[in-house]
Amino acid sequence: PSTIDCTGLYVSPGFIDTHTHGGGGCDFMDGDVESILTAARLHLHHGTTTIFPTTLTSSNEDLFLCIDNFKKARGITENMPHLAGMHLEGPYFSPTEKGAQNEDYIRTPSPEDYMHIYEYADGCISRWSVAPELSGAMEMGDRLSKLGVLMSIGHTAATCDDVKEAIQHGYTHLTHFYSGMSTITRKNGYRILGVIEAGYLFDELSVEIISDGMHLPPDLLKMILKCKDNNKISLITDSMRGAGAGEGKSILGSLKEGQEVIIEDGIAKMPDRTCFAGSVCTTDRCVRTLYKLAGTSLENAVRMMSLNPAKLMKIDDHKGSIAAGKDADLLVFDDDVNIKQIFVGGKEIK
């Protein structure tokens, strides 16, 4: 065995991104295998050794094409991160909290629809983000959580009471905490708690944060770390195709059905600049930003990008930490989390 000199550097577990839509100019929904490989490899070179390609609300036709391509891409391991499973973000969302999701395809969950999608995917779906207040969403949570799918609450106008009920029906996680979710509202003077408050109130809920320093400003990152059990926090990129691709015009979603966005100031925005349209973040930047801006330790930031997501996705028996018997997915980086070396399954990525 060869010896690698890491003097003055850190060795960490590979990063695990459970919520990303693309990068390197490609979206996972572009409709061809090559786009999946390009996006995955872009993220690999920034430290993501395990990735859960994420879809957007779309037609089932586009969704099934994405699933087909994911299955093909999974068979290609050369110079690739581990494609651990798919994260379906949509189509069962609240229209009022849709963010940049395509309203034309947003609908309520029916067993005929979601079981058709689930069965078509043939075990590829690891996670599904749903608005739990929709008619049929509780039954969906019951059915899919029993099948091993992580049920996550996202793009939702639910009340805290809705979330309380959703927890009884298999929902355990909040999709991009603070983004696309309700907060306290007033009705006849009375305060009604929203999903954000539920994230703090219910210890059993895990949350994920886009730690690009833009979606959540530094003080908000600090507050989340102060108020929520840090073992229940994962970092995500929620990156779109513009990750690693520079500023200017881009497209959110598939080239065919997606919408135009603008990348500036290190973030993607809707053309009228009224709201963000996903990040252009990579996992190394997530860790670096949390570490530098939120006043937490590098070890804690790394855990939130490795062991915590591994536990969330129930793959921590072989991923997420450096331990005997686990996959040798390793990173070597400096004090500023500039990646120097990457190993997937013990093989160095050049």
Language model: regions and residue ranges:
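Active-site gating loops and adjacent loop-to-helix segments of metal-dependent hydrolytic enzymes
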Residues: 41-52, 95-122, 165-206, 246-277
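Divalent metal-dependent hydrolysis catalytic cores, especially in the metallo-beta-lactamase
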Residues: 21, 37-66, 81-94, 121-133, ...
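Histidine-rich, glycine-flanked metal-binding segment
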Residues: 1-12
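Active-site core of metal-dependent hydrolases
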Residues: 115, 119-247
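Histidine-centered catalytic micro-motifs
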Residues: 13-27, 90, 154-156
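His/Asp/Glu-enriched, well-ordered alpha-helical/loop segment
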Residues: 191-209, 225-237, 242-332
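Alpha-helical scaffold segments that flank or form the walls of functional sites
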Residues: 18, 28-81, 105-120, 299-302
